[in-house]
Swiss-Prot record:
May be involved in the control of meiotic sister-chromatid recombination. GO terms for biological process: DNA recombination; meiotic cell cycle. Its main location: membrane. This is Meiotic sister-chromatid recombination protein 3. It is found in: Cell membrane. It is a peripheral membrane protein. The keyword Chloroplast does not apply. GO terms for cellular component: plasma membrane. It comes from Candida glabrata (strain ATCC 2001 / BCRC 20586 / JCM 3761 / NBRC 0622 / NRRL Y-65 / CBS 138). Signal peptide: none annotated.
Length: 834
């Protein structure tokens, strides 16, 4: 059973050393291990062969390839039964290695087996063989890497063994990386290279007494190039190297072709070396001469270039001459292999040195030319001329005729200035101006460019005209006195212009006012401000008498209104005239209102203790009489919405007059107020305020004054509740005069009665068809001046209730009349009387 079979010990595969015994037929097989598969004499069969299914490494310098097709030495092995189904290294070839474990010494080389990969696949179906055939159809692939003591990979060997019907096809691919040992600084070869000199000029490798190569020689074989042993391969390699050198020489010849630098001098860091074509010959002669005598010493007296001794010292400038060195040779046999290697090393080094020297010389030519010139100091005159020329080019660009001429002459000479150092002595290249480029566009006939140029010219001309800046060349530096005088002159001029303009305006207005005989309709255009546009839609015209807005000064004959701004001063400015007319119109409206109020005061009987006066509520701003503008009863045809809202707000806000207006309103104490005939002075009746008790949430009892409900206290406007105001005077201390409208429409005054005192019977009151009281709010405001709208309405309701008690109207009718009067008085206050 296969599971109970004991697993044999695996033996390492030593086939990676097969290429070492290639082309060595004289080696005794008794001293070296020869695999039984190769018959002991076919050592070159596994040397170096290319793989069929794998591509060689393109970076490898040498690839050896050999193909071998060998018949099995034991044909009867194909008829043996299979030795288990485990795919391991237990093959006939591997088990035979156990009889002899001797291996050649590897010296100092550290050989490491990187990876071993075995792949065995049955090809019975492909070849049409039987199933019970032994495991002879298989493929084995082995990959081995060899590294040196420094850890660098020296070679990679891939061996593929294909067993088909008793035949073995061995394919071995060896990829080697040639690393030549670097020479020391004193020119000696490395210690591991045991080179000797003989009469024929060739050197051989050292052998031990027992006829076996030394471990060092064995290691050198791993380090060397295995392709060099083949004559055909060596010829191909030499041809490739020669072609590479010729390519380098051709490149260097093209780089050296510079007519401007043919006679350059040698740099300080450059060495005196012979022509480059003799480098290889001199190197071979020196190497042959040094090894010509057996055991003799020869001193190298020639001057050796630094680049040939060491590749590291090409950047070292410490020594320009290398001292002579001494070499010792040992009498040994010769070998063609090492001589070929030495000859091969000289040729690539020659091309490498040539390329390095040429690049160094080519890169330093410009630096030598620049350092060869010596700077000479400029005189003051030369420095001034150069500075002046540069300044002209910066300021005037190409406007200077001389510069333009030079640019025209040099336009066809396109000389490259890259890499040249600019000095003040050299003539600077003239840049192409914008005018030249625009001329070129004009010649091409581009319409778009022409339009762009015209727009640019127009903008430039506008900027030059608007700024009017004098040229900088004509400016002078002003002293402090001159600057002060100029500033004073400018200030005086501005002041005189302003004064003359004002005087001319006033004089023209005076002349126009004097020459105007009759007022003429104004035809001058008037500025339509925000007020005019806003109030035009609210003008009402009811075909009644209108107030003339024209000023007393009349109109100018030219068409502009002459408005009197101050006593004896008029103006024709439409804006000023408009403002003056508006102010005068508002003043006339106030006078008319005050006249109406004074008329109401004359008919009303003042209450006891009230400051009654026949003067208007507001003192007139003008000294002219009221009758000069309008009659007391003449209604106003035009009301401005702003004035209406302001007046309505003041009436509901409880407007308080200023001190001067208060003094004008108070009548002198010596002039007692008199009432018209047929009326009597009513005495004020003090009625205590009713109070009601309320219980708080903590059980305490509080007494609050019984006032009207909140619905009665609500104002028609929001001004009263949103702004602080003074408390109005109680109605119990004021005797109101309420004007009522009779059926005939005449105004009569009746004293207001209180709940405690029954007034005299009032005549029948009617407004329209319903017999309801009509409250004149203007009369109430004229009498009190600060009594709110709600208080007057409440007092009117009390008077209506008293009238109803005497037989006039019922309480229900009085209440209805009060609500109706509120709405009508609000509309009448907002849009004027009707």
């Amino acid at each position: 059973m296969g599971f109970l079979t004991k697993k044999e010990r695996r033996v390492p595969d030593l086939s990676r050393y097969d290429y070492h015994y290639q082309n060595k037929p004289a080696v005794d097989s008794s001293k070296y291990y020869v695999p039984r598969e190769y018959g002991g004499k076919r050592l070159s069969a596994s040397a170096a062969a290319a793989a069929i299914y794998t591509n060689p490494n393109p970076n490898a310098t040498g690839v050896s390839r050999s193909y071998s097709l060998m018949h099995s030495y034991n044909p009867a092995a194909a008829r043996q039964p299979p030795a288990g189904r485990t795919y391991s290294l237990r093959s006939d070839r591997a088990s035979s290695i156990t009889s002899n474990s001797r291996r050649p010494a590897a010296g100092k080389a550290q050989v490491r087996r990187a990876s071993t990969q075995q792949r065995r696949a049955s090809v019975d179906q492909e070849l049409g063989t039987g199933v019970n055939q032994p495991r002879t159809n298989s493929i084995t692939v082995t990959t081995t890497k060899v590294r040196d003591p420094q850890g660098r990979t020296k070679s990679i060997t891939k061996k593929t063994v294909r067993r088909i019907n008793g035949y073995e096809v061995v394919e071995t691919t060896t990829t080697t990386t040639t690393t030549e040992p670097l020479p020391t600084q004193n020119g000696k070869m490395p210690a591991n290279m045991d080179l000797v000199s003989v009469e024929d000029g060739t050197d051989v490798e050292e052998e031990h007494d027992d006829g076996l190569p030394s471990p060092q020689a064995h290691f050198d074989e791993f380090s060397g190039d295995f392709v060099a042993e083949d004559d055909l391969s060596s010829e191909v390699l030499q041809h490739q190297q020669q072609q590479y050198i010729e390519d380098i020489v051709e490149e260097e010849t093209e780089e050296e072709e510079d007519p401007g630098h043919t006679g350059t001098k040698r740099l300080p860091g450059e060495f005196n070396e012979p022509p480059r074509t003799n480098i290889a010959a001199r190197r071979s002669n020196s190497l042959t001469g040094s090894l010509s005598s057996l055991g003799a010493k020869k001193t190298i007296s020639e001057e050796v270039p630094l680049d040939q001794t060491s590749s590291v010292s090409k950047f070292s400038d410490a020594m320009e001459y290398i001292p002579p060195t001494t070499t010792t040779a040992k009498p040994k046999k010769s070998n063609l292999r090492n001589s070929m290697t030495a000859r091969k090393l000289a040729q690539p080094q020659q091309g490498q040195n040539q390329r390095r020297t040429v690049s160094f010389t080519q890169g330093s030519i410009d630096h030598m030319n620049t350092t060869k010139k010596k700077k000479q100091p400029l005189t003051e005159q030369e420095m001034y001329l150069q500075a002046l020329e540069v300044a002209k080019k910066k300021v005037y660009k190409t406007d200077d005729p001389a510069v333009v001429g030079n640019a025209a002459n040099n336009s066809n000479k396109r000389v490259s200035t890259m890499g040249k150092r600019m000095t003040l002595r050299d003539s600077a290249p003239v840049p192409r101006s914008s005018s030249m480029m625009m001329n070129k566009f004009h010649d091409q006939g581009s319409a778009r460019n022409n339009v762009a140029q015209q727009q640019t010219d127009v903008r430039r001309s506008k900027s030059m005209t608007g700024s009017a800046v004098p040229p900088q060349a004509g400016k002078k530096k002003l002293t402090d006195e001159e600057m002060y005088e100029k500033a004073l002159e400018i200030a005086q001029k501005r002041y005189n212009d302003l004064v003359s303009a004002d005087t001319a305006a006033v004089g023209a207005a005076s002349v126009g006012a004097a020459s105007a005989a009759t007022p003429v309709a104004s035809t001058a255009p008037k500025k339509s401000g925000f007020k005019q546009r806003f109030t035009k839609t609210f003008h009402t015209d009811d075909n009644k008498s209108k107030i003339n807005n024209a000023s007393a000064g009349g109109m100018v004959s030219g068409g502009a209104a002459a408005v009197e701004v101050a006593p004896g001063v008029t103006t024709t400015d439409p804006v000023v005239a408009e403002n003056v007319n508006e102010a005068s119109q508002i003043e006339r409206m106030d006078n008319v209102e005050m006249a109406s109020a004074s008329a109401a005061n004359e008919y009303a009987a003042p209450a006891a203790g009230f400051r009654a006066t026949s003067a208007p509520l507001y003192q007139s701003r003008s000294a002219e009489p009221v009758g000069a503008y309008a009659a007391p009863d003449a209604p106003i045809s035009k009301y401005k919405i702003v004035d209406k809202i302001l007046k309505f707000a003041q009436s509901n806000y409880g407007y308080q007059a200023h001190d001067d207006e208060e003094a004008a309103m108070v009548a002198p104490a010596s002039a007692p107020a008199t009432a018209p005939a047929g009326t009597s002075m009513a005495q004020p009746v003090v009625v205590p305020v009713e109070r009601r008790s309320s219980v708080g949430k903590h059980g305490n009892t509080t007494t609050l004054p019984v006032e009207t409900p909140l619905a009665d206290n609500a104002s028609e406007s929001s001004f009263r509740h949103t702004h602080p105001q003074e408390q109005p005077v109680p109605l119990s201390q004021i005797e109101k005069k309420i004007s009522v409208v009779s059926e005939t429409g005449s105004r009569k005054a009746a004293p207001a009665a209180t709940a405690a005192k029954t007034p005299a019977t009032a005549p029948a009151m009617s407004y329209g068809t319903a017999k309801t009281p009509f409250i004149d709010i203007d009369a109430v405001d004229a009498l009190s001046g600060h009594v709110p709208f709600e208080e007057a309405t409440r007092h009117a309701s009390v008077a209506t209730a008293a009238t109803a008690a005497t037989g006039g109207t019922t309480g229900t009718a009085a209440t209805t009349g009060t609500g109706t009067s509120k709405k009508k008085s609000f509309l009448r206050k907002l849009f004027g009387r009707k």
